[in-house]
């Protein structure tokens, strides 16, 4: 019950920090849908047909759609459960700050791949969910929406499938598979973005694409776009480069007894060589092992030995954190914020491309400060855990 006691305070905080993400992969809900009270008072001025469906379609429809990655569709009012069956869970997720899974704090540096649900639209959904979930004008015929199994950024310049199918058998809910994929390039290629086409959309939970012995090309989550780095930056793949693909699988409850076979495909988007001739490199700063003390703020640091332009950051977390801040500290003592996160959970790792890259000199100290969150709070329950690390995407000087 302590989680519910904090919902009101979190709701106020969400609205004051201005925006909340709309890329809703995941209302991964701990509770199941319950029956709807037909006699519940309809106090909301907003209805599903007029106000709520367009918001859910445009902001959550990549995942919460029939055949999509999420275990339920929110794009019907009551068909097969529909949004009305999940209204209470939607409310809980929004008030807890647990969903949508986007954690960039707008008081920090702006990030490129941001999809926001503005406070007004957030308020509409919460008001509808708590105000009797009215259906609205029944003469409005809503369009049928199905999952689009295609490339969000258009057909890639090169598609590289997994070398062999991977099977997750019955009664196996989670698994991981790591493979190498040769590019067979006869010359160097410059890559501006990388995407993934999941073989089984309902099961491919996340993926990491990197160059063997080189930079991280993509941190992929369902519903994400393939976003270009800022200021024309790009990755360089040498002739004969080999890619490493790691895919994490997580079945929904509907598929627990099924044997599912995945053959995901990497998509590469090429570009011209940047004017600088410099390629994005990956630098990692490892945190302490063992997990945080729930009552004590955590901090660690590393050094950017070679100067460069920071174009992106990739936090990997070992626990939920109420706040995460990455700061560059120059030899003079001057501090520059690189990234701020709020209510961040480890099961949603992301790459945050900066809107405005930040130039740092050699031997800049990188400080990371974290305020622990409650690993068991809220509708999501206990979080997954990964090794604590902050990845930096750097274009060398």
Task: List where the protein language model places each region.
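Noncatalytic modules at the cell exterior or secretory-pathway interfaces
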Residues: 191-192, 234-254, 358-374
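Beta-sandwich interaction modules
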Residues: 219-239, 345-362
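Extended, compositionally biased non-globular segments
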Residues: 314-386
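N-terminal secretory signal peptides that target proteins for export/translocation
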Residues: 1-12
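Aromatic- and Gly/Pro-enriched helix-to-coil junctions and flexible linker segments
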Residues: 31-189, 197-200, 209, 240-251, ...
């Amino acid at each position: 019950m302590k989680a519910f006691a904090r919902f009101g305070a979190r709701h106020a905080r969400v609205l004051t920090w201005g925006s909340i993400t709309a890329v809703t992969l995941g209302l991964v809900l701990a509770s199941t849908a319950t029956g709807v009270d037909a006699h519940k008072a309809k106090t909301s001025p907003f209805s599903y047909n007029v106000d709520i469906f367009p918001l859910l379609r445009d902001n959550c429809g990549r995942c919460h759609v029939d055949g999509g990655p999420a275990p339920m569709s929110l794009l019907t009012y009551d068909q097969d459960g529909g949004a009305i069956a999940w209204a209470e869970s939607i409310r809980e997720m929004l008030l807890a700050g647990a969903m949508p899974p986007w954690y960039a704090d707008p008081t920090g540096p702006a990030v490129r791949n941001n999809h926001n649900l503005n406070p007004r639209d957030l308020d509409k959904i919460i008001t509808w969910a708590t105000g009797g979930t009215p259906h609205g004008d029944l003469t409005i015929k809503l369009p049928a929406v199905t999952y689009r199994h295609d490339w969000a950024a258009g057909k890639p310049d090169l598609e590289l499938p997994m070398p062999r199918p991977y099977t997750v058998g019955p009664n196996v809910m989670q698994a991981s598979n790591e493979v190498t994929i040769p590019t067979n390039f006869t010359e160097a290629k410059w890559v501006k973005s990388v995407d993934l086409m999941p073989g089984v959309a309902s099961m491919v939970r996340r993926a990491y694409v990197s160059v063997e012995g080189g930079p991280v090309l993509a941190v992929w989550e369902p519903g994400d776009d393939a976003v270009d780095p800022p200021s024309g930056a790009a990755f360089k793949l040498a002739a004969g480069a080999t890619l490493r693909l790691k895919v994490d699988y997580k079945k929904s409850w509907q598929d627990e007894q099924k044997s599912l076979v995945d053959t995901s495909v990497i998509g590469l988007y090429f570009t011209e060589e940047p004017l600088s001739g410099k390629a994005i490199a990956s630098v990692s700063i490892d945190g302490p092992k063992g997990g945080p003390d729930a009552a004590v703020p955590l901090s660690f640091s590393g050094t950017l030995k070679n100067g460069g332009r920071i174009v992106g950051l990739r936090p990997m977390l070992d626990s939920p954190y109420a706040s995460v801040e990455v700061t560059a500290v120059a030899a003079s003592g001057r501090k520059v914020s690189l990234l701020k996160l709020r209510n961040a959970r480890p099961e949603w790792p992301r790459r945050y491309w900066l809107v405005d890259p930040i130039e740092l000199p050699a031997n800049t100290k990188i400080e990371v400060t974290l305020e622990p969150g409650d690993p068991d709070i809220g509708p999501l329950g206990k979080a997954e855990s990964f090794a604590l690390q902050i990845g930096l995407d750097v274009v060398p000087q």
